[in-house]
Amino acid sequence: MGAGPGRMDSALICIMYLYIKALHIIFIVTWFSGMFYIVRLFIYNTEAEEKTGPAREILTAQFRIMSRRLWLGITWPSAILTLILGPWMWILLGGTPEWLIVKLIFVVLLYGYHFSLHFIYREQQKGIFRFSSQKLRIWNELATLFLFIIVFLASVKQVMSWVFGTVGIVSLALVLMLAIRIYKRMRTK
């Protein structure tokens, strides 16, 4: 069989899909890195706000600069590029498997989480601190749950039984909460 136009188009689509997938993964990694680190900066900024004198002024000013550079220079661009590349892959895939529908639901929720971080970012840039460092630590772990769920769905490529998935997520959430409590005790000693 010769290499007709149909085969060439199919091969080109496969190659294109792989390159887009690689870029999609890279921007997912940088997006998650940004979300994990921005909450750490929120925590440090919140704790710096509790200090007095020059230490407070110097630290909060520095954390605002670091937050702005991270959020606007890395995290938002990565979220936007992820949003562009994901649907592009979906179009090239040419179908919508069941696992992808479930994954997309969690991706929409992840963007909701991202917007909640943007709300906190804007408030902290204005000097408004509504959340304690402990609440921010707990909020930070939500990204971990999203990461586990989305990666497992994308890797296993099937909708796991709801019982297995629910038990796994609840177990992970409990382990994360336990780790936060242990860390809090270690910090206060």
Regions found by a protein language model. Give the residues of each.
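Polytopic transmembrane helical bundles with strong interfacial aromatic enrichment
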Residues: 9-189
